[in-house]
Amino acid sequence: MVRCDRGLQMLLTTAGAFAAFSLMAIAIGTDYWLYSSAHICNGTNLTMDDGPPPRRARGDLTHSGLWRVCCIEGIYKGHCFRINHFPEDNDYDHDSSEYLLRIVRASSVFPILSTILLLLGGLCIGAGRIYSRKNNIVLSAGILFVAAGLSNIIGIIVYISSNTGDPSDKRDEDKKNHYNYGWSFYFGALSFIVAETVGVLAVNIYIEKNKELRFKTKREFLKASSSSPYSRMPSYRYRRRRSRSSSRSTEASPSRDASPVGLKITGAIPMGELSMYTLSREPLKVTTAASYSPDQDAGFLQMHDFFQQDLKEGFHVSMLNRRTTPV
Protein backbone atom coordinates (compact mmCIF):
# COMPACT_ATOMS: atom_id res chain seq x y z
CA MET A 1 0.00 0.00 0.00
CA VAL A 2 2.84 2.36 0.83
CA ARG A 3 4.59 1.57 -2.43
CA CYS A 4 1.35 2.16 -4.34
CA ASP A 5 0.85 5.55 -2.69
CA ARG A 6 4.46 6.49 -3.37
CA GLY A 7 4.16 5.42 -7.00
CA LEU A 8 1.02 7.54 -7.37
CA GLN A 9 2.77 10.51 -5.76
CA MET A 10 5.74 10.08 -8.08
CA LEU A 11 3.42 9.95 -11.10
CA LEU A 12 1.60 13.10 -9.99
CA THR A 13 4.93 14.82 -9.38
CA THR A 14 6.17 13.99 -12.87
CA ALA A 15 2.93 15.12 -14.53
CA GLY A 16 2.84 18.29 -12.43
CA ALA A 17 6.44 19.15 -13.30
CA PHE A 18 5.69 18.88 -17.01
CA ALA A 19 2.46 20.89 -16.63
CA ALA A 20 4.11 23.69 -14.61
CA PHE A 21 6.95 24.10 -17.10
CA SER A 22 4.58 24.01 -20.09
CA LEU A 23 2.23 26.58 -18.59
CA MET A 24 5.04 28.99 -17.75
CA ALA A 25 6.72 28.58 -21.13
CA ILE A 26 3.43 29.30 -22.91
CA ALA A 27 2.77 32.29 -20.65
CA ILE A 28 6.08 34.06 -21.31
CA GLY A 29 6.02 33.19 -25.02
CA THR A 30 2.57 34.60 -25.81
CA ASP A 31 1.22 38.16 -25.97
CA TYR A 32 -2.07 37.76 -24.13
CA TRP A 33 -1.23 38.94 -20.65
CA LEU A 34 -3.34 42.09 -20.89
CA TYR A 35 -6.20 43.46 -23.01
CA SER A 36 -6.32 47.24 -23.11
CA SER A 37 -7.18 50.24 -25.24
CA ALA A 38 -4.32 52.22 -26.81
CA HIS A 39 -3.84 55.06 -29.28
CA ILE A 40 -0.84 53.38 -30.86
CA CYS A 41 -3.01 51.52 -33.37
CA ASN A 42 -4.71 54.60 -34.88
CA GLY A 43 -2.29 57.44 -34.10
CA THR A 44 -0.98 57.77 -37.66
CA ASN A 45 -4.48 57.78 -39.18
CA LEU A 46 -4.84 61.44 -38.30
CA THR A 47 -3.65 64.33 -40.48
CA MET A 48 -2.51 67.77 -39.44
CA ASP A 49 -5.86 69.27 -40.48
CA ASP A 50 -7.80 66.91 -38.27
CA GLY A 51 -5.89 68.04 -35.21
CA PRO A 52 -4.96 65.93 -32.19
CA PRO A 53 -7.35 63.25 -31.04
CA PRO A 54 -9.87 64.15 -28.34
CA ARG A 55 -8.62 63.84 -24.80
CA ARG A 56 -11.48 61.55 -23.78
CA ALA A 57 -11.34 59.38 -26.89
CA ARG A 58 -10.45 55.79 -26.21
CA GLY A 59 -7.77 54.04 -28.19
CA ASP A 60 -8.19 50.86 -30.14
CA LEU A 61 -8.20 47.49 -28.46
CA THR A 62 -4.81 45.82 -28.04
CA HIS A 63 -3.39 42.73 -26.40
CA SER A 64 0.08 42.70 -24.92
CA GLY A 65 2.59 40.32 -23.42
CA LEU A 66 5.86 40.79 -21.59
CA TRP A 67 7.70 42.34 -24.54
CA ARG A 68 5.18 43.19 -27.30
CA VAL A 69 1.86 44.91 -27.86
CA CYS A 70 -0.37 43.89 -30.76
CA CYS A 71 -3.27 45.81 -32.30
CA ILE A 72 -6.67 44.19 -32.62
CA GLU A 73 -8.35 47.26 -34.15
CA GLY A 74 -7.25 50.30 -36.15
CA ILE A 75 -5.10 50.72 -39.22
CA TYR A 76 -2.34 48.62 -37.64
CA LYS A 77 -4.65 45.69 -36.97
CA GLY A 78 -2.60 42.49 -36.72
CA HIS A 79 0.69 44.34 -36.24
CA CYS A 80 2.82 44.03 -33.10
CA PHE A 81 5.21 46.58 -31.65
CA ARG A 82 7.93 46.32 -29.08
CA ILE A 83 6.91 47.76 -25.73
CA ASN A 84 8.74 50.91 -24.74
CA HIS A 85 8.75 51.02 -20.97
CA PHE A 86 10.65 54.33 -20.87
CA PRO A 87 9.06 56.83 -23.28
CA GLU A 88 11.22 59.82 -24.19
CA ASP A 89 8.54 62.38 -23.42
CA ASN A 90 8.35 61.26 -19.80
CA ASP A 91 10.93 62.39 -17.28
CA TYR A 92 11.63 59.67 -14.68
CA ASP A 93 13.37 59.99 -11.39
CA HIS A 94 16.04 57.29 -11.41
CA ASP A 95 15.79 56.90 -7.63
CA SER A 96 12.04 56.39 -7.54
CA SER A 97 10.34 53.05 -6.95
CA GLU A 98 8.35 53.43 -10.19
CA TYR A 99 11.56 53.53 -12.19
CA LEU A 100 12.84 50.37 -10.48
CA LEU A 101 9.56 48.62 -11.12
CA ARG A 102 9.75 49.56 -14.79
CA ILE A 103 13.28 48.13 -14.99
CA VAL A 104 12.17 44.84 -13.47
CA ARG A 105 9.06 44.81 -15.65
CA ALA A 106 11.11 45.49 -18.78
CA SER A 107 13.65 42.77 -18.02
CA SER A 108 11.03 40.17 -17.00
CA VAL A 109 13.76 38.53 -14.94
CA PHE A 110 11.46 36.72 -12.53
CA PRO A 111 9.31 34.87 -15.10
CA ILE A 112 12.44 33.82 -16.99
CA LEU A 113 14.12 32.66 -13.78
CA SER A 114 11.00 30.72 -12.84
CA THR A 115 11.02 28.93 -16.20
CA ILE A 116 14.69 27.96 -15.82
CA LEU A 117 14.10 26.62 -12.31
CA LEU A 118 11.09 24.63 -13.50
CA LEU A 119 13.20 23.07 -16.24
CA LEU A 120 15.93 22.09 -13.77
CA GLY A 121 13.35 20.71 -11.36
CA GLY A 122 11.79 18.60 -14.10
CA LEU A 123 15.20 17.17 -14.98
CA CYS A 124 15.76 16.28 -11.32
CA ILE A 125 12.38 14.54 -11.19
CA GLY A 126 13.31 12.46 -14.24
CA ALA A 127 16.71 11.61 -12.75
CA GLY A 128 15.01 10.66 -9.48
CA ARG A 129 12.83 8.12 -11.29
CA ILE A 130 15.90 6.58 -12.94
CA TYR A 131 18.09 6.61 -9.82
CA SER A 132 15.40 5.77 -7.29
CA ARG A 133 17.87 4.95 -4.49
CA LYS A 134 19.27 8.49 -4.36
CA ASN A 135 16.85 10.50 -2.26
CA ASN A 136 18.82 13.73 -2.51
CA ILE A 137 17.78 14.13 -6.16
CA VAL A 138 14.09 14.20 -5.20
CA LEU A 139 14.81 16.69 -2.42
CA SER A 140 16.68 18.95 -4.85
CA ALA A 141 13.72 18.81 -7.23
CA GLY A 142 11.35 19.87 -4.46
CA ILE A 143 13.56 22.82 -3.52
CA LEU A 144 13.82 23.91 -7.16
CA PHE A 145 10.06 23.80 -7.66
CA VAL A 146 9.40 25.81 -4.51
CA ALA A 147 11.96 28.43 -5.62
CA ALA A 148 10.40 28.51 -9.11
CA GLY A 149 6.96 29.15 -7.64
CA LEU A 150 8.27 31.98 -5.48
CA SER A 151 10.03 33.58 -8.44
CA ASN A 152 6.85 33.28 -10.48
CA ILE A 153 4.64 34.95 -7.90
CA ILE A 154 7.15 37.77 -7.43
CA GLY A 155 7.08 38.39 -11.18
CA ILE A 156 3.28 38.48 -11.17
CA ILE A 157 3.22 40.93 -8.26
CA VAL A 158 5.73 43.18 -10.01
CA TYR A 159 3.67 43.02 -13.21
CA ILE A 160 0.56 44.16 -11.39
CA SER A 161 2.25 46.71 -9.10
CA SER A 162 4.19 48.49 -11.82
CA ASN A 163 0.91 49.59 -13.40
CA THR A 164 2.44 49.13 -16.82
CA GLY A 165 0.20 46.30 -17.83
CA ASP A 166 -1.16 48.66 -20.44
CA PRO A 167 2.00 49.41 -22.46
CA SER A 168 0.32 52.04 -24.61
CA ASP A 169 0.56 55.77 -24.54
CA LYS A 170 -2.54 56.24 -22.44
CA ARG A 171 -3.00 59.44 -20.54
CA ASP A 172 -2.92 59.57 -16.77
CA GLU A 173 -6.71 59.76 -16.41
CA ASP A 174 -7.21 56.65 -18.55
CA LYS A 175 -4.56 54.38 -17.03
CA LYS A 176 -6.84 53.14 -14.27
CA ASN A 177 -9.56 51.85 -16.59
CA HIS A 178 -10.23 49.87 -19.75
CA TYR A 179 -7.95 46.88 -19.22
CA ASN A 180 -8.26 43.29 -18.06
CA TYR A 181 -5.94 40.32 -17.84
CA GLY A 182 -5.72 37.66 -20.51
CA TRP A 183 -5.25 33.91 -20.53
CA SER A 184 -1.44 34.15 -20.63
CA PHE A 185 -1.52 35.90 -17.26
CA TYR A 186 -3.73 33.18 -15.79
CA PHE A 187 -1.46 30.50 -17.23
CA GLY A 188 1.41 32.05 -15.30
CA ALA A 189 -0.65 32.14 -12.09
CA LEU A 190 -1.71 28.51 -12.59
CA SER A 191 1.93 27.55 -13.13
CA PHE A 192 2.72 29.00 -9.69
CA ILE A 193 0.06 26.81 -8.02
CA VAL A 194 1.19 23.65 -9.82
CA ALA A 195 4.88 24.32 -9.08
CA GLU A 196 4.27 24.73 -5.36
CA THR A 197 2.15 21.56 -5.27
CA VAL A 198 4.87 19.58 -7.04
CA GLY A 199 7.48 20.94 -4.63
CA VAL A 200 5.46 19.83 -1.60
CA LEU A 201 4.91 16.36 -3.11
CA ALA A 202 8.62 15.96 -3.86
CA VAL A 203 9.61 16.90 -0.30
CA ASN A 204 6.97 14.51 1.07
CA ILE A 205 8.36 11.66 -1.06
CA TYR A 206 11.85 12.38 0.27
CA ILE A 207 10.65 12.33 3.90
CA GLU A 208 8.81 9.01 3.45
CA LYS A 209 11.82 7.40 1.76
CA ASN A 210 14.10 8.61 4.53
CA LYS A 211 11.79 7.20 7.22
CA GLU A 212 11.61 3.83 5.48
CA LEU A 213 15.39 3.72 5.12
CA ARG A 214 15.87 4.46 8.83
CA PHE A 215 13.38 1.77 9.83
CA LYS A 216 15.05 -0.78 7.55
CA THR A 217 18.50 0.05 8.92
CA LYS A 218 17.29 -0.26 12.53
CA ARG A 219 15.62 -3.59 11.82
CA GLU A 220 18.75 -5.00 10.18
CA PHE A 221 20.85 -3.83 13.14
CA LEU A 222 18.56 -5.55 15.65
CA LYS A 223 18.54 -8.71 13.56
CA ALA A 224 22.33 -8.72 13.34
CA SER A 225 22.71 -8.16 17.09
CA SER A 226 20.32 -11.01 17.93
CA SER A 227 22.18 -13.43 15.64
CA SER A 228 25.60 -12.49 17.03
CA PRO A 229 27.71 -15.40 18.45
CA TYR A 230 28.32 -13.41 21.62
CA SER A 231 24.64 -13.59 22.50
CA ARG A 232 24.84 -17.43 22.61
CA MET A 233 27.70 -17.49 25.15
CA PRO A 234 26.69 -18.50 28.74
CA SER A 235 28.61 -15.63 30.29
CA TYR A 236 26.84 -13.17 28.00
CA ARG A 237 23.46 -14.60 28.96
CA TYR A 238 24.40 -14.53 32.64
CA ARG A 239 25.32 -10.86 32.45
CA ARG A 240 22.03 -10.05 30.76
CA ARG A 241 20.00 -11.99 33.35
CA ARG A 242 22.00 -10.61 36.23
CA SER A 243 20.89 -7.05 35.56
CA ARG A 244 17.25 -8.12 35.40
CA SER A 245 17.29 -10.26 38.58
CA SER A 246 19.21 -7.87 40.82
CA SER A 247 16.09 -6.96 42.78
CA ARG A 248 15.06 -10.60 43.13
CA SER A 249 18.46 -11.63 44.52
CA THR A 250 18.25 -9.01 47.24
CA GLU A 251 14.84 -10.35 48.33
CA ALA A 252 15.92 -14.03 48.27
CA SER A 253 19.13 -13.59 50.32
CA PRO A 254 17.49 -13.78 53.82
CA SER A 255 16.28 -17.32 53.05
CA ARG A 256 19.86 -18.53 53.14
CA ASP A 257 20.18 -17.73 56.87
CA ALA A 258 18.07 -20.69 57.94
CA SER A 259 18.92 -22.09 61.37
CA PRO A 260 19.94 -25.76 61.60
CA VAL A 261 17.71 -26.20 64.68
CA GLY A 262 14.66 -26.89 62.54
CA LEU A 263 16.40 -29.63 60.53
CA LYS A 264 15.62 -33.19 61.60
CA ILE A 265 17.67 -35.99 60.13
CA THR A 266 16.53 -39.55 60.91
CA GLY A 267 18.88 -42.41 60.42
CA ALA A 268 22.24 -42.44 58.87
CA ILE A 269 22.99 -40.28 55.84
CA PRO A 270 24.79 -42.12 53.03
CA MET A 271 27.99 -40.68 51.63
CA GLY A 272 26.40 -40.05 48.21
CA GLU A 273 23.68 -37.86 49.66
CA LEU A 274 26.18 -36.01 51.78
CA SER A 275 28.30 -35.21 48.75
CA MET A 276 25.21 -34.02 46.87
CA TYR A 277 24.23 -31.76 49.73
CA THR A 278 27.67 -30.27 49.95
CA LEU A 279 27.89 -29.72 46.17
CA SER A 280 24.46 -28.13 46.02
CA ARG A 281 25.51 -25.57 48.58
CA GLU A 282 28.71 -24.57 46.78
CA PRO A 283 27.16 -22.25 44.13
CA LEU A 284 25.57 -20.22 46.85
CA LYS A 285 29.02 -18.94 47.78
CA VAL A 286 29.43 -17.33 44.36
CA THR A 287 27.95 -13.97 45.18
CA THR A 288 29.02 -10.40 44.84
CA ALA A 289 30.77 -8.48 47.54
CA ALA A 290 27.59 -6.54 48.17
CA SER A 291 25.72 -9.69 49.40
CA TYR A 292 28.47 -10.79 51.85
CA SER A 293 27.25 -11.25 55.47
CA PRO A 294 29.21 -12.60 58.51
CA ASP A 295 26.02 -14.03 60.00
CA GLN A 296 25.41 -16.02 56.85
CA ASP A 297 28.93 -17.60 57.00
CA ALA A 298 28.51 -18.44 60.70
CA GLY A 299 25.22 -20.18 59.98
CA PHE A 300 26.84 -22.14 57.20
CA LEU A 301 29.65 -23.35 59.54
CA GLN A 302 27.11 -24.43 62.16
CA MET A 303 25.24 -26.39 59.52
CA HIS A 304 28.48 -28.10 58.41
CA ASP A 305 29.36 -29.12 62.04
CA PHE A 306 25.85 -30.41 62.56
CA PHE A 307 26.12 -32.64 59.50
CA GLN A 308 29.44 -34.11 60.72
CA GLN A 309 28.11 -34.86 64.22
CA ASP A 310 25.04 -36.59 62.84
CA LEU A 311 27.24 -38.56 60.48
CA LYS A 312 29.41 -39.85 63.34
CA GLU A 313 26.41 -40.76 65.51
CA GLY A 314 24.69 -42.51 62.64
CA PHE A 315 27.83 -44.45 61.77
CA HIS A 316 28.30 -45.50 65.46
CA VAL A 317 24.68 -46.71 65.72
CA SER A 318 25.03 -48.78 62.56
CA MET A 319 28.18 -50.47 63.91
CA LEU A 320 26.44 -51.37 67.17
CA ASN A 321 23.53 -52.86 65.27
CA ARG A 322 25.87 -55.03 63.30
CA ARG A 323 27.58 -56.29 66.50
CA THR A 324 24.36 -57.06 68.38
CA THR A 325 22.55 -58.67 65.51
CA PRO A 326 22.55 -62.50 65.86
CA VAL A 327 24.03 -64.42 62.95
Swiss-Prot record:
Residues 226-236, 246-256 have a biased composition (Low complexity). One of its GO terms (molecular function) is calcium channel regulator activity. Residues 1-9, 129-136, 208-327 are cytoplasmic. Its main location: membrane. GO terms for cellular component: AMPA glutamate receptor complex; cell body; cell surface; glutamatergic synapse; L-type voltage-gated calcium channel complex; postsynaptic density membrane; somatodendritic compartment. The chain crosses the membrane at residues 10-30, 108-128, 137-157, 187-207. Keywords: Calcium, Calcium channel, Calcium transport, Cell membrane, Glycoprotein, Ion channel, Ion transport, Membrane, Phosphoprotein, Transmembrane, Transmembrane helix, Transport, Voltage-gated channel. Gene3D superfamilies: 1.20.140.150. The lineage of its organism: Eukaryota, Metazoa, Chordata, Craniata, Vertebrata. Interacts with CACNA1C. Identified in a complex with the L-type calcium channel subunits CACNA1C, CACNA2D1 and either CACNB1 or CACNB2. Acts as an auxiliary subunit for AMPA-selective glutamate receptors (AMPARs). Interacts with GRIA1. This is Voltage-dependent calcium channel gamma-4 subunit. Residues 226-262 are annotated as: Disordered. Regulates the activity of L-type calcium channels that contain CACNA1C as pore-forming subunit. Regulates the trafficking and gating properties of AMPA-selective glutamate receptors (AMPARs), including GRIA1 and GRIA4. Promotes their targeting to the cell membrane and synapses and modulates their gating properties by slowing their rates of activation, deactivation and desensitization and by mediating their resensitization. The gene is Cacng4. Glycans are attached at residues 42, 45. It is found in: Cell membrane. Belongs to the PMP-22/EMP/MP20 family. CACNG subfamily. It is a multi-pass membrane protein. The modification Phosphoserine is found at residue 259.
